[in-house]
Amino acid sequence: MPLKSPFYDSSDNLIHDGWLLLRASNTPCTVLRPEIRSRFLLLSLQKPSADESPDNDKELSSNPDSGKKRKRRVLFSKAQTYELERRFRQQRYLSAPEREHLASLIRLTPTQVKIWFQNHRYKMKRARSEKGMEVTPLPSPRRVAVPVLVRDGKPCHTLKAQDFNPATFPTGIPFSAYSAQSLHHMQYNAQFLFYH
């Protein structure tokens, strides 16, 4: 697609293509002949057209004769977006086979699905942080002492209140390892189970 510029005409296609290649490879203009260098400098001073925007500057088309030099931004259909969002709600990360399967279902490439998921994760993270809903780690689960109902491989059917020696618990674990509330709860449950 020709640039809209007074310095550009249809005969400049070769110069323009060369300029794009030099820009992409970061080659200095000083390696060019002086008459071509001046045209490259004029081209480099122009604002990029829609086809040369920084978003699209990375990938050149494999077909040099096709008027388009850059890949355009892909707009997904409502059905594709719906399916991507539905799957994202189920699973925030997809394995390669899952990506390929989803891509084939909604007629996208696995790379497009991967990038959509990356962008959507970032979008959700940013939205959470803006709302002050930053994910806080859950507190670690509370440790609770459980009464031993088996002793030496045999069920403890005759467990009595005197078996709860204040110095040690039946398994030989020091009393200090359990909170007083946990032991009281265990004593109450043991008495309830065996005396009622």
Curated annotation (Swiss-Prot):
GO terms for cellular component: nucleus
Compartment(s) where it occurs, according to its Swiss-Prot or TrEMBL record: Nucleus
GO biological process: cell differentiation; regulation of transcription by RNA polymerase II
Keyword Nucleotidyltransferase part of the UniProt annotation: no
SUPFAM superfamilies xrefs: Homeodomain-like
Ranges for region Disordered: 48-72
Residue ranges the UniProt entry marks as DNA-binding: 69-128
Major location category of this protein: nucleus
Superkingdom of origin: Eukaryota
Keywords linked to the UniProt accession: Developmental protein, DNA-binding, Homeobox, Nucleus
Tissue expression notes: Forebrain and midbrain.
Family: Belongs to the NK-2 homeobox family.
Annotated function: Defines dorsal-ventral domains in developing brain. May play a role in defining positional information along the anterior-posterior (a/p) axis and the dorsal-ventral (d/v) axis of the developing nervous system. May be involved in determining positional or boundary information rather than determining a given cell type.
Name the record gives this protein: Homeobox protein XENK-2
Organism: Xenopus laevis
